[in-house]
């Protein structure tokens, strides 16, 4: 393979992955490296998007490159991979300490394009590349540049950042189910079962009583068994970030 062919090969993730064929690494790990722009050449690990050159796999250096604030290839990979951005918040000791027990906040930040790149207290947007000191989710959202693809990436429902700290009384209020209003319209046929039973039955199996409240949308719609299979709310299709079990009505 001549140099021109090799340069063409490393333009794609698959091509960079193929350059690592002789490396004694797990294929899944090789693919992750290739996604961030890394490839193997003359027994060295190089990057197509920055000047990174490694003579061997170094976990710390690989992590710094993966969540880089300077590499074009890593930034592009982060921009198209929310799970990768989310993982950055658990990849550094300082981020684990800062965002401990704040999984909902981390989800919201990752969804908005932000990731942690190793500088204590600071975040970077994978879309507009803005770097700033983190204060709150709302403040972070205002930092986006006007042409950023994540500028309007806001959930339909707002979540209190300190939701995990709500007391029992507040959680019971959030878990309350609103019964649909009764209409003064005479039905054309008698109901198959009492209205109270329809209101309290699970919207998935229509058998057991609903007892799990989804957050952040706050819909109480399914039973405990069915809730385990739900990734999105069956009422509004919002992504489920937390489940709260309630007492039978």
Swiss-Prot record:
Cleavable signal peptide: none
SUPFAM superfamilies in alphabetical order: Inhibitor of apoptosis (IAP) repeat (SSF57924)
GO biological process: symbiont-mediated perturbation of host apoptosis
Transmembrane parts of this sequence: none
Chain ranges of zinc fingers (RING-type): 202-237
PROSITE patterns tied to this protein: BIR_REPEAT_2 (PS50143), ZF_RING_2 (PS50089)
Gene Ontology molecular function: zinc ion binding
Xref: PANTHER family: INHIBITOR OF APOPTOSIS
Protein name: Probable apoptosis inhibitor 2
Species for this entry: Autographa californica nuclear polyhedrosis virus
């Amino acid at each position: 393979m001549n140099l021109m062919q090799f340069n063409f090969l490393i333009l794609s993730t698959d091509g960079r992955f193929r350059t690592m064929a002789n490396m004694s690494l797990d294929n899944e790990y090789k693919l992750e490296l290739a996604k961030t722009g890394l490839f193997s050449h003359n027994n060295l690990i190089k990057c197509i998007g920055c000047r990174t050159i490694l003579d061997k796999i170094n976990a710390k250096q690989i992590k710094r490159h993966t969540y880089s604030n300077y590499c074009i290839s890593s930034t592009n990979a982060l921009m198209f991979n929310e799970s990768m951005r989310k993982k950055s918040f658990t990849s550094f000791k300082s981020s684990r300490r800062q965002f401990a027990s704040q999984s909902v906040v981390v989800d919201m930040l990752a969804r908005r394009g932000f990731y942690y790149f190793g500088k204590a207290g600071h975040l970077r947007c994978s879309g507009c590349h803005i770097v700033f000191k983190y204060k709150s989710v709302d403040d972070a959202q205002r930092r986006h540049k006007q042409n950023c693809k994540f500028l309007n990436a806001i959930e339909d429902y707002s979540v209190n950042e300190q939701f995990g700290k709500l007391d029992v009384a507040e959680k019971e209020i959030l878990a309350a189910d609103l019964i649909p209003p009764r209409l003064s319209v005479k039905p054309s046929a008698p109901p198959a079962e009492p209205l109270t039973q329809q209101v309290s039955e699970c919207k998935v199996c229509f058998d057991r009583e609903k007892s799990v409240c989804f957050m952040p949308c706050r819909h109480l719609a399914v039973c405990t068994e069915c809730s385990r299979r739900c990734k999105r709310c069956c009422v509004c299709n919002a992504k489920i970030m937390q489940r709260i079990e309630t007492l039978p009505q």
